[in-house]
């Protein structure tokens, strides 16, 4: 990639709710980098630049449907970080422009059917050119993907065993922003529920096992001895599990995972009778909600009760949030390896900002140390694209990331 491009990183969707947080993060953590804010509104971008005048970001205007403007944007930077969702509506042309110009790309999407389209359209071209297109670099799906990979890596290094299974248990405290809500509802509007339900939606062709149905998402409450708690299905599980399974398939040559590797994730609900009741209630509520949102009139009604795009929790609420992802991996001969990724701050906003910004900074600053070398490209997952480089950057940003023995 040409080093003469004017910018190292462009933040697309910078005036949105999460976008503004990425601007603040870059203003505080990207000294020495050449970066710019981008979006469709000149006035909003100028106001944003004035707010962060000391950081002196550049300003680029490009509508999400203007291929020529997006080509011009992609040609001016080495990395694009996009927070402009729903990505099925506002992301496709930008990804295409990045692939055409060999510009690395990260985003915060959880829209797996859209990611499948990007894989089908662009994986081969991006792989050929060494361009890293990395969707899902927010809370969806960095903790799951990086955590499962670190557990599998530790099993191999410490026990000389391939990883046969990993399960993850999430504890979260935080709110929903309008962009996330719009992305979730947009995915249902597109009539792609059968794709959402496919456990191996994101896998390369020919890598799904014959018993794919046995990997379907958990539906009920369960008592788990490893986590010593009652668990319910995790609302983001149908996103994160697909990403982890794609990682295992893409890394098959590394022999970290068994051919029949299994991954599932859950939400922690507590212990005893209260935990059992809560887990059962959540499981029933999720099933009922999913059925209800399958009807367009109910989706439109639900949209009136969630934040609008550009809105989200208060600064105080985001600061008081937190997340914890505990993982238990089992090796092919039965060895057990635990791991944990945790952090302070609302997971969908504060943590997502750290995840995606550090992913972009890894591309901009650590390209020579990334796994696979300069020639690795394609529509990748966070662990395949960044590996230990991202883990180290997240530790440096204050997150807890630690595989540990039982």
Label for each model-derived stretch:
Residues 25-32, 251:
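A short, Lys/Arg-enriched amphipathic alpha-helix followed by its capping loop at the start of a domain
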């Amino acid at each position: 990639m040409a080093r003469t491009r004017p910018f190292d990183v462009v933040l697309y969707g910078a005036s949105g709710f999460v976008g503004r947080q990425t601007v603040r993060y870059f203003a505080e953590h990207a000294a020495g980098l050449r970066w710019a804010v981008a979006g469709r509104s000149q006035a909003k971008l100028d106001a944003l630049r004035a707010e962060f005048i000391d950081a002196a970001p550049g300003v680029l205007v490009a509508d999400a449907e203007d291929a020529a403007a997006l080509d011009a944007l992609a040609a001016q930077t080495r990395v694009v970080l996009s927070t402009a969702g729903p990505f099925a509506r506002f992301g496709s042309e930008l990804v295409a422009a990045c692939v055409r110009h060999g510009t690395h790309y990260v985003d915060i999407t959880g829209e797996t059917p859209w990611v499948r389209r990007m894989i089908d359209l662009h994986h081969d071209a991006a792989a050929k050119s060494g361009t890293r297109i990395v969707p899902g670099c927010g809370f969806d799906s960095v903790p799951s993907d990086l955590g499962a990979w670190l557990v599998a890596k530790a099993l191999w290094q410490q026990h000389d065993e391939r990883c046969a299974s990993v399960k993850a248990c999430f504890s979260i405290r935080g709110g929903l922003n309008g962009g996330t809500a719009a992305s979730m509802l947009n995915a249902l509007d597109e009539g792609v529920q059968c794709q959402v339900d496919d456990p191996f939606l994101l896998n390369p062709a020919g890598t799904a096992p014959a018993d794919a149905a046995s990997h379907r998402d958990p539906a009920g409450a369960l008592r788990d001895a490893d986590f010593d708690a009652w668990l319910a299905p995790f609302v983001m599980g149908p996103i994160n599990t697909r990403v982890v399974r794609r990682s295992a398939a893409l890394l098959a040559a590394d022999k970290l995972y068994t051919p029949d590797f299994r991954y599932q994730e859950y939400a922690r609900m507590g212990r005893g009778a209260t935990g059992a009741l809560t887990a059962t209630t959540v499981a029933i509520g999720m099933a009922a909600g999913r059925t209800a949102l399958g009807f367009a009139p109910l989706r439109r009604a639900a949209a009136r009760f969630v934040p609008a795009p550009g809105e989200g929790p208060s600064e105080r609420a985001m600061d008081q949030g937190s997340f914890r992802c505990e993982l238990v991996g089992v090796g092919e001969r039965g060895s057990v390896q635990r791991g944990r990724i945790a952090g302070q701050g609302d997971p969908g906003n504060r943590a997502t900002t750290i995840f995606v910004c550090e992913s972009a900074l890894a591309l901009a600053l650590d390209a020579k140390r990334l796994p696979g070398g300069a020639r690795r490209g394609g529509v990748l997952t966070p662990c395949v694209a960044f590996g230990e480089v991202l883990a180290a950057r997240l530790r440096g940003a204050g997150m807890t990331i630690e595989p540990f023995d039982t």
